[in-house]
Amino acid sequence: MEKFEVHILGCGSALPTTRHFATSQVVNIREKLFMIDCGEGAQMQLRKSKLKFTRLNHIFISHLHGDHCFGLMGLISTFGMLGRTATLYIHCHAELERLLTPQLDFFCKGMSYKVVFQTFDPGKAEIIYDDRSLTIETIPLRHRIPTCGFLFSEKQIPAHIRRDMIDFYEIPVYELNRIKNGADYTLPDGKIVPNNKLTIPSALPRRYAYCSDTIYLPHIIEQIYGVDLLFHEATFAQSEQARAKETFHTTASQAGEIARTAKVKQLLIGHFSARYEDESILLQEASDIFPNTLLARETLKISIESIKP
């Protein structure tokens, strides 16, 4: 089974604490690493995770609050000291490129690799990354400044050929690609062999949605409907609902409601306010509405399993 893992580097919010690093994650899909947000200390957590720096080529920044991007310059500089040669792509709002370019020119001149900014409009849902096995799409969110989440979607792979049936019907090799892609096969006598006799369905494609930071926003449900794993911020308990609304954040109960209505398979909550020394109240409030809820914590790794159709 191909890897599809989410590694939690940090799960705190804006105020640094001794318990949590700022929210940051790495998604490992088939040994390609994708970082989501890069708060202060993210590179130290990346080292602890034992993930290979050389496989991290894409970083996605949800918005321009410091707890989501203050770690970028340090990480970029470290890559340079390690002699990196592969291009690093930073997917972000255009403002971040304008902010970081002078710093790169000052601190990172003459590095052995290129940093390329690929900008997007956070208010628009669009595919911003596409390869042969994966797409990454923005999820417009509502925060105090322009913000988006990210939807990671595997592409459906072709069905698996049944070698025994191919041999039985003496089907030539040049027909196999058509059959893998869903075609039936016509025998020399005109009889049609249906595709489902010649193939075994491949596993269903997996999806992961990352939604932080945002006010309670039901209109994201259509875009994230049915995902295998949803990370949703749960900055506050329900007793702080007014504060959550004022600061454009979400309560744990509201995160649970989003997960339940969107019929996701599993909910992971994070971006915890520093006021909570024990986040069990947040887990309880989310679980009361959506039982299959996990509490994010540093070093947590979640594997999204393949599901047979």
Curated annotation (Swiss-Prot):
Q: Name the Gene Ontology molecular function terms of this record.
A: 3'-tRNA processing endoribonuclease activity; zinc ion binding
The record's active-site residues are: D67 (proton acceptor)
Give the record's keywords alphabetically.
Endonuclease, Hydrolase, Metal-binding, Nuclease, tRNA processing, Zinc
InterPro entries according to UniProt:
Metallo-B-lactamas (IPR001279), RibonucZ/Hydroxyglut_hydro (IPR036866), RNase_Z/BN (IPR013471)
The gene for this chain is rnz
* Family statement drawn from the similarity comment of this UniProt entry: Belongs to the RNase Z family.
Subunit composition and interactions: Homodimer.
Q: Would you tell me the protein name for this molecule?
A: Ribonuclease Z
Q: How is the cofactor bound?
A: Binds 2 Zn(2+) ions.
EC class (word): hydrolase
Residue positions annotated to bind Zn(2+) 1 are H63, H65, H143, D213
Reaction catalysis annotation: Endonucleolytic cleavage of RNA, removing extra 3' nucleotides from tRNA precursor, generating 3' termini of tRNAs. A 3'-hydroxy group is left at the tRNA terminus and a 5'-phosphoryl group is left at the trailer molecule
EC code: 3.1.26.11
The UniProt record lists the keyword Metal-binding? yes
Q: Which domain of life is it from?
A: Bacteria
Which residues participate in Zn(2+) 2 binding? D67, H68, D213, H271
Which residues belong to the signal peptide in this entry?
none
